[in-house]
Amino acid sequence: MADRRRQRASQDTEDEESGASGSDSGGSPLRGGGSCSGSAGGGGSGSLPSQRGGRTGALHLRRVESGGAKSAEESECESEDGIEGDAVLSDYESAEDSEGEEGEYSEEENSKVELKSEANDAVNSSTKEEKGEEKPDTKSTVTGERQSGDGQESTEPVENKVGKKGPKHLDDDEDRKNPAYIPRKGLFFEHDLRGQTQEEEVRPKGRQRKLWKDEGRWEHDKFREDEQAPKSRQELIALYGYDIRSAHNPDDIKPRRIRKPRYGSPPQRDPNWNGERLNKSHRHQGLGGTLPPRTFINRNAAGTGRMSAPRNYSRSGGFKEGRAGFRPVEAGGQHGGRSGETVKHEISYRSRRLEQTSVRDPSPEADAPVLGSPEKEEAASEPPAAAPDAAPPPPDRPIEKKSYSRARRTRTKVGDAVKLAEEVPPPPEGLIPAPPVPETTPTPPTKTGTWEAPVDSSTSGLEQDVAQLNIAEQNWSPGQPSFLQPRELRGMPNHIHMGAGPPPQFNRMEEMGVQGGRAKRYSSQRQRPVPEPPAPPVHISIMEGHYYDPLQFQGPIYTHGDSPAPLPPQGMLVQPGMNLPHPGLHPHQTPAPLPNPGLYPPPVSMSPGQPPPQQLLAPTYFSAPGVMNFGNPSYPYAPGALPPPPPPHLYPNTQAPSQVYGGVTYYNPAQQQVQPKPSPPRRTPQPVTIKPPPPEVVSRGSS
């Protein structure tokens, strides 16, 4: 570049000499003033070269420039404006040539030609002058430069450009083009004090204008004294559409969609069941005097009512245990009276028990039958069904024995039970024997939580029933109830526990069991009932090939037997072929319909998730449909397929009330009767005591 420039400079000098007349015509004064002025108007003169026709004009300009450089005229220009000399040169230069190097400068401004500009700076000012004198033709050979006069040329004085380029070398962190550049200005960095050398001085002069307006910025959130007082009711209503503060006053509260009960209840449930429950319970108390009203009340009040109400309800309604509404067709209303969840549990259990009890003993349990009636009526179409309202309370009362805690637990379990227990479809009325068919109606299995409570509730009702069902009693000794008492039994509604005929006995037993366990808390019941060996799950579900002593089970107990001969009315054989769901094995299986509706209780579905009753057949929760709970639970048995009763040895009386077959525990009600064992002593209030391991154990563990 330097060589080229020198050549150009020499050529220019020659041109100047040869065209001295031209330069003279410009006149040195002109050159000084006029030429300077021309350079000053660089933009306009920039277009001159092309207009002037090329070289002559260019030469003239160049002469002016070069002459100025060498003569006083140039010094005049520079002296006028220290920047102007260079500016003139650069302007003319770019103006002269279509591709003046000044283009480079302007580009450099765009940060394109920094290196070039540095190289140019390296060249002496004389070189620059020479550059200014470059011939247009030589320059025109340069390609890629902007055409002069296209408006892109730099308007900035060269001096400034040069100063920017060369003299000032920016640090990496200050050079915007360098990735290491650290911004030190701008809103985001106004508090960044890292490189604060001149920062504070520089900032103020730069920009004083605000980029945004703060005026109304916090209007929406300003503290206003007049807004600090509580709003009036009118204001609240205007704001929210209702008075958000009046939670006690339902009418004032914003109308909301009525939520389903947490556990969902069968649709049949009476929408007003909540209100009804109380009425019914009172009614039952009155009607079923036998049942202690307090039991029902306690259960309900404490939420323990689940048992009482649920029994009746579940029986009749087969409500889903956990559901707020009870299945019971009638139960809807009946159950309604009880507390929602507890009632449900209780309803299902109680209804089963009551139904059984009622069916067995309609007179004392007219109310109970009513409880069971929805399903009872369907299954047995028992007169007791007529007393649906009255019936539910009695079962609830039986709950009284249950402790509140038990009721509460039961309730809690209800949700599980609902999931686990399937309702057993009510058998046809014909299926159920003369005894109230409440059992027949499959009570939906009570939720696991509810099973115990229902038994208790049944207990009160059962007591009545038992009194009336002395017959049943014969089979079931009070002792039986005790074995039944174990929460399994308790948990099972009587109706479930007992077969259609046997249910009365079963009720009796249950009663007894309840009495035994009545005082017991749910927790104690949850413990393995004292009665005999803890049964595996209370699946007393009828196991194939297992025989249940009729005495033991009031309801038909199925057992797989070789001979199909039916057992005594109270005893029932379950065919192996029968689909009695094993409570543990087949959670939601529904048993096949019994061949003898009268003989066999309606199928009971057992929810597998329910805790198995520990002692008796009757699981606290409803056993799987196949499970027999005390007598004829409502388990359906395959009709006509009664296997011959298994040998009695299966259930030796001497043996503990429970035997386990195939993972199912079967209890011999008769034996259990004999064993009036009350439920195990109540557990201490704290369900589990956690003690630190003895030091030895600890040391072992550590070692």
Swiss-Prot record:
Modified-residue entries (Phosphothreonine), positions: T357
InterPro entries from the UniProt entry: Btz_dom, CASC3
Biased composition (Gly residues): 29-46
Entry coiled-coil feature ranges: 95-131
Stretches with biased composition (Basic and acidic residues): 109-119, 127-138, 158-178, 211-234, 245-255, 341-355, 413-422
Location(s), subcellular: Cytoplasm; Cytoplasm, Perinuclear region; Nucleus; Nucleus speckle
Effect recorded for W218A: Abolishes interaction with EIF4A3, EJC formation and localization in nucleus speckles
Reported impact of Y181A: Does not affect EJC formation
Tissue spec: Widely expressed. Overexpressed in breast cancers and metastasis, as well as in gastric cancers.
Residue list for modification Phosphoserine: S35, S117, S148, S265, S363, S373, S477
Post-translational modification, as annotated: ADP-ribosylated by tankyrase TNKS and TNKS2. Poly-ADP-ribosylated protein is recognized by RNF146, followed by ubiquitination.
Motif window: Nuclear localization signal 1: 204-210
Disulfide cysteine pairs (residue numbers): none
Primary location class: cytoplasm
GO biological process entries: intracellular mRNA localization; mRNA export from nucleus; mRNA splicing, via spliceosome; nuclear-transcribed mRNA catabolic process, nonsense-mediated decay; regulation of nuclear-transcribed mRNA catabolic process, nonsense-mediated decay; regulation of translation
Region (Sufficient to form the EJC): 137-283
Subunit structure: Identified in the spliceosome C complex. Component of the mRNA splicing-dependent exon junction complex (EJC), which contains at least CASC3, EIF4A3, MAGOH, NXF1 and RBM8A/Y14. Identified in a complex composed of the EJC core, UPF3B and UPF2. The EJC core can also interact with UPF3A (in vitro). Forms homooligomers. Interacts with STAU in an RNA-dependent manner. Interacts with DHX34; the interaction is RNA-independent.
Stated name of the protein: Protein CASC3
Species name: Homo sapiens
